[in-house]
Amino acid sequence: MAGAGERKGKKDDNGIGTAIDFVLSNARLVLGVGGAAMLGIATLAVKRMYDRAISAPTSPTRLSHSGKRSWEEPNWMGSPQLLNRDMKTGLSRSLQTLPTDSSAFDTDTFCPPRPKPVARKGQVDLKKSRLRMSLQEKLLPYYRNRAAIPAGEQARAKQAAVDICAELRSFLRAKLPDMPLRDVYLSGSLYDDLQVVTADHIQLIVPLVLEQNLWSCIPGEDTIMNVPGFFLVRRENPEYFPRGSSYWDRCVVGGYLSPKTVADTFEKVVAGSINWPAIGSLLDYVIRPAPPPEALTLEVQYERDKHLFIDFLPSVTLGDTVLVAKPHRLAQYDNLWRLSLRPAETARLRALDQADSGCRSLCLKILKAICKSTPALGHLTASQLTNVILHLAQEEADWSPDMLADRFLQALRGLISYLEAGVLPSALNPKVNLFAELTPEEIDELGYTLYCSLSEPEVLLQT
């Protein structure tokens, strides 16, 4: 009665709030925990829609401080934006109000007839089995028709990359013999047969040779910036080996080897010193440096409608640490080198699949294709998806092809959980949060898109 009295003064309230509260408070007795949770979600949605309908349009509680729609306005309002933390909190709070312990109810005063648990469980299991089989039947055709790259296209793109790599290697040896470099080599998902949809990008690693006694790497978490997964490369022993003792002293900024300055050095070589049109005519390609901001990227047209982008990526190795000049998303960290984990991640994934003929790589490629084809999921990277699969591989042992649908759904749920926490630890280096460079708004949008797909995951395969 107290609840009803409090709601009495609400504008135009006809008692629906009291009815909803009564339904929610007794749902546990009739439906059980799972049914009560689902009823809670549905009832909360109806209740909010009703409240929104009877509230004044200018009500300040309907908009966030920024004026944007928030989690209080779900997807039926036509907003593609992700649910924010306010609605997550509201939804969690609403579900938490549902009783979950049978001891909380007085069974002497209210003993409704219990449904047959065995029959109900059997119906639920049958429905889940049918949904899983339906999804399983759709995942493999999606991979064949949408994700997999035709073998011919993949071979031609690889050959174009090999030709460009050979030309650059010859140029560097002939024109820049004093530059201490190891041989350049190809890397990336195309090279590792993990690229999807179209063969359109590959990395060309340019390894710098650094004197081990003149340089050291400092983990980002040990600096004032506190950025795990990144390193500073410090110039050592300047009192014994003055500036100029190392070729790469010319790229030192503030006592540290600057990846940006190194990249600028190679940009002059890639864009200014090499006659790419002449090389392209010799190889029967159209080659040109990509426009800014892709300063260290070549665009190669190897067929009339086929383009390959080759990223030049300077790299340094100090001890067991391999770093690449791939900048942090925030400009304030442009003096940091990124820890290279991709080769080790790919090797672990391949080794796991080879050991049991599993479908981990297949599941990863389907997820990558979905993200590449869905603009709302475009901020998810191959590294993040790979680590979701690696974490799941530690929890689940059976990765036979028949389990593809189950593992796919588990990967989606796991990804949503990581997004909700805002943390995706690297499977190889747990100190590294792979979501650290995403903004809260991007995390919300990604989480909402995936959250909405859980009820009907086939929608993701239709993009």
UniProtKB/Swiss-Prot annotation:
Membrane topology recorded in Swiss-Prot or TrEMBL: Single-pass membrane protein
One annotated Gene Ontology cellular component of this protein: mitochondrion
Gene Ontology terms, MF aspect: nucleotide binding
Region of interest (Important for interaction with DNM1L), ranges: 160-169, 234-243
Alphabetical keyword list: Membrane, Mitochondrion, Mitochondrion outer membrane, Nucleotide-binding, Phosphoprotein, Transmembrane, Transmembrane helix
Positions of region (Dimerization): 49-195
SMART domains linked to this entry: Mab-21 (SM01265)
Cytoplasmic side: 47-463
Protein name, as recorded: Mitochondrial dynamics protein MID51
Gene that produces this protein: MIEF1
